[in-house]
Amino acid sequence: MPNQPVITPRGLRSRFSLVAVVLGFGISAASGADAGVITGNVSNAATRNLLSGARVEIPSLALGALTDDTGRYVLAGVPAGSHEVLVSYIGLDSVRRQVSLAAGQRVAQDFDLTTGIYKMDQFKVVGEREGDAAAITAYRNSENLKNIAATDSFGNLPNLNAGEVAIRLPGIYGELDAGGNLAGFTVRGMTSGLNSVTMDGGLMTGQGGMGRSIFVNNITGAMFEQVELVKGHTPDKGADSLGGTINFKSRSPLSMREKRRITYTVTGRIAPSFTQQIPIREDRRLHGLATLGYQEVFDAFGGSRNLGVSLTLFNSETAIGSFFTTRDYQNTMTSPAFLWDYRWDDLYNHRRQKNITAKADYRLTPSTKVSFLGTYIDHSEVFRRQYNVRAFTNGQAQDTVPSATTSIVPGYTSRITTVRPVASSVIDVTMTGPNNFFNRLRRVDAGFEHEKGPLQLEGNLRYTQTHINIGNGEGAVLTNRITGTGWIIDRTESDLYPKFLANGGLDFTNPANYRPTANGLSNQNDQQIHEVTEGRLDGRYTLPISAPVFAKAGVHWREQHVGVRSASRRWSYTGTTALPHDPNLLTMDRRMTGRAIPQWEASWFMKSREVADPSIWREDLYFRETTKYTTYRDVVETVTAPYLMGQGKLGREGWAGRTGFLGGVRWEKTENEADGWVRARVLSTAAQQTADPAGSATRDYANNRRVIDGDYTKAFPSVHAWHDWTANLKTRLSWSTSFGRPAFGNLSPAETPNETQRAITINNPALLPQTAKNWDATLEYYFEPVGNLTVGWFHKEIRDYIVSGIESGTVGTGSDNGYNGEYAGWTILSTANAGTAVVQGWEFSYQQQFTFLPGLLKGLSGMINYTVLDTHGNYGGTTRRGSGQIAGFVPRTANASLSWRYRGFSARLLVNYAGEFLQSYGAASPARNLYRMERTLINLGLSYQLRPSLTLTLDVDNLSNEPQRRYRGVIENMEYFNYPGTTITFGFNGRF
């Protein structure tokens, strides 16, 4: 296997020793003499929240600090005497106060900040304003490039999905599923499997089987305070995110002034009767959602307000219903092109979710804090149903030349295709469900922080698991087929709902003419496992020099375990008559077109994962036995990452005091071990499989278990610099390295022999990640009240794309050659790393609250961001390709919001835009290119606060019922069209 470590294990051990030396030096140096200290909390007087990132300074001494996540600050090294302390925070009035202290004394001093806008009765709604200010403050104070949004910055979230906030950040494209729900993220052109999603810095587990995509449809925004998009990676954080890392940040339970706080939300989500919905959705229009939050601060074990606890309960039911159609056309860029494959679907899904999140922060001493977080999420789907009809010319597809004998009749137009009633003219009717999906996510995170003089230590231990059971449950997948029937598809009057007319042959509206296909009844029963165990220890030491500079070192360790299992089964029909159909089932297609294609319910023929009538079904027992082997995959990935870095400013005052830097290097050693079965060189015959299915499966797979491993070590340096030209103008420049790991499926055992070419294709457990060298530059301008303007440019040079079919050696001889003695002398073909590409772009962002405007306009605020990307390179191939030739690369995205507040009333309009992009690339023929059309999603939100404990809300999701659309080759050839529907969420929330 290819294995090209950049750093030897011996070199890695030396770096561990260096980390230990640095931490040891810090501990010994931390025992210096006592110094005067001013400490305390900074809060927002109106909201009673303690403020993170507030600046506390003594200007005469050029001494300053920022408050932490609990609103606490520490000014150390303060000489005896009286000093003026200045406290400032974006959107609030600065406060100056004289504070006196004796030599070596520790003085507590709290500050409550406010602003005139909070004192005006017509502006009662302050949560959103504070959220914007907190996000801008965190961004301004950040040492690296990141975008930050508060979860309350965009009003009420109709689904309370934290991902709905993330897609409003510059450079993110939200990937939607068939029901219109957010499934994943593309960041700066990098697809979801190449980006990391974290919670408080710890990796989240996914739902993608052997992939690396992290779906967020089970992560509620009620758990978090902010969403961060990290684009400039630093050595003390993971670099395994090619486009950017999305981090969901929870709130400390110590971060409030009150003794106790209770919040709640109750909403109902309805598919209104005046909007277009599929019939099965109309029967289940309304579903509910509720959250309850509890937060309290205690005086524990002799301390004062030193224990904070919070508990968040979340329960929701969500229903989706969508009609969509999928088509395929003749392989030509000219018009007309015949339509040879026409499908339409009704999809309904009912999701239930229950979350419990508990968090505690305990400050043992003024310099030591321990924390705990536990998350319990159950996400279930027990009524997913999909009805599919496919009319196609089997065996005569896009390259068919119509003639007197083909399925496609010559003389077709761009809107009308005629199909002959021949054997290759087929209609399949498939019903899937009701499917089951059970996702059980558990997370435990324990951490500590400790300060002693110039030394700060912190660490965490985390465990996260996602266990998924997915399949058909008591249902199944059933496909009934009719052959030798003809039809005419006429899209003249409606492309979405065309006429589908009979053209001879068997009557496709008569259920008696349909029979199940071979293996046409199946029951899926899969398990997916994703477990992440992490540990980290970080030490930071403030250097004894005049400039505020510190050194930081640490080591992070993470183990991921990913596995898939299956007990799926399938049956063939042995009966002679048609199966009973459901004459009462009404689909969207039948309602809109009147065509009466019969439908069947798969669950009628299953009972407790067995066929209801064994006398008319024959199971494929060989498939059942081999599935135990062919679907079993297990991968364990272990990452050990020490790092060293320095951070600070060039001086305390003047130009040097306004110039900061951060730089260092992170080393990551990755070790992979994978386990699974592969096929024997010679498989049993069909007759043997029928006569002895279990024995045949054993002979074909049981003796071919493979345990393979690989490793690599890489260094990831980064350098970041920033300068404050004025109090409001800031620039940043950074160079960083990052990477995207290969999917776990690329690491697991797989062998495909080719007897003709005497070659065997295998997977590569030592496959290297795709790497990127990143340049970022930004110009940022901040203005009061609560606003900023940012212009950014970035450039990524990406290397080591994953390429298959690369010769990587020759199989040796002997029984220990790794292939049970088989394939001696054969060529080994595997995946390897090759190719380069460049991705670059511009990002523009502007937001402001217009409280300086007169009269009612004072309540306006707005936000807009726009990202434009470009790319070129060979992407691991042999030819140069550009932006329009890279599948999944989204060149343009934008977001906008406009809100208005007056007294207790607020209104908000949200717009999310994604430009057209290539979804699938056909290098051999541009007519096979698949394009996703531009998409503009509009949400409208209204609320009225009767009192702090009661606010009424009304939100419209997908106001214009924007569809998801794709086309094949040319825009007139619609390949996919999906109306996810419009929903209205109404309810109330409050705080006590």
Task: Describe the role of every protein-language-model region.
Residues E282-V422, V429, N436-G447, G453, ...:
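Transmembrane beta-barrel wall of Gram-negative outer-membrane proteins
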Residues G206, N218-T265, G302, S322, ...:
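A beta-strand signature from Gram-negative outer-membrane beta-barrel systems
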Residues A29-E128:
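Periplasm-facing N-terminal accessory domains of Gram-negative outer-membrane beta-barrel systems
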Residues L860, Y913-G922, S943-F992:
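C-terminal beta-signal and adjacent terminal beta-strands/loops
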Residues P253-R260, D299-L307, S367, G453-E458, ...:
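Short loop/turn motifs that connect adjacent beta-strands in outer-membrane beta-barrel proteins
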Residues T430-R443, T631-E637, G710, F739-I798, ...:
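Outer-membrane beta-barrel signature, preferentially recognizing the C-terminal barrel domain
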Residues F794-E797, I802, E807-G809, T813-Y921:
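Gram-negative outer-membrane beta-barrel transporters
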Residues D93, A103-A108, Q122-T186, M190-G193, ...:
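Periplasmic N-terminal accessory/gating domains of Gram-negative outer-membrane beta-barrel systems
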